[in-house]
Amino acid sequence: MELTIEQIEGVMSLVLDGRRRLDLRNVRFIDPYGLLLLDLVLRDRAEGSAPLNVVWPTHPPVRNWMQAMGLAFDVSATLRPKSRLPNVRTALQPITRIEDERGVIALVNGFDARLAERYPLDESPRRTLIRIMLELFQNIPQHSNATGNVSDAHGIAAMQDYRDGIVLAIADKGVGMRASLSLRGEEKVGSDAEALDAVVLRGLSRFRDPGRGQELMRIFRMVRSWDGTIAIRSGSALLYHDPEHGADVHDVAPFPGVQIALCIPTRVFGIGEVDGAPEDGFNEPDE
């Protein structure tokens, strides 16, 4: 069992359908996107009235990585930290809280420094990744509480490297794309799928100024040109692209906010495949 960009939706559906017991004991791999969605949906259940009994993974590398990345196994009793240093070398960038625009540059610099410690990145793609992170992180304070109705508006982000790719994930539990677009005051956006299409494929935003918006559209096209994988989830819709099958929009279990994952090939940054076998404690996908 794996909790990845492609497979986490099964767990989301179970939890959001009201399942009272979630058995994760056989999970052998989880990526940052799966980790963030699991964190958000479990906290959502903990804040509600329906208790959820979670049987956590028993595979030591997976447990070690999840804890090093900052996931609290007792989500109802532990507040998520603003940032946590990893306690094993292989946790690249643990779950980090994004609150306001003033702190975004410092967070991006921290992500960049963690990656630079591990690899000698080519300068041009490194700057591109910094711009991508700036855009995605700024989207949290700019859009997640666009209506002013979210009591604790914040986002979370995490990053991990693998043999042939780097996965960056950003997520919030805000108002979502459809509610944000509704503030344009134009025609009503009928569905979450239509909102995804408008924002990601046509470059619209809640701002009418033609100089605003289009960031997600540019990032989507960039990742696609790199033969990478990208997932953008909002409400009941998921836009998923991989180099083998292209892009498609899927119906998913409704959940508030926007959740994004990018899987960028390491060769884009001038990095060859990561050499060496994974050390003990490493959360690595099966071959």
Residue positions per predicted region:
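Amphipathic alpha-helical interaction surfaces in cytosolic regulatory modules
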Residues: 2-77
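Flexible, glycine-/charge-rich segments associated with ATP-binding catalytic modules
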Residues: 1-16, 76-82, 86, 201-287
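Conserved helix-loop functional segments at active or binding sites
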Residues: 117, 142, 146, 205
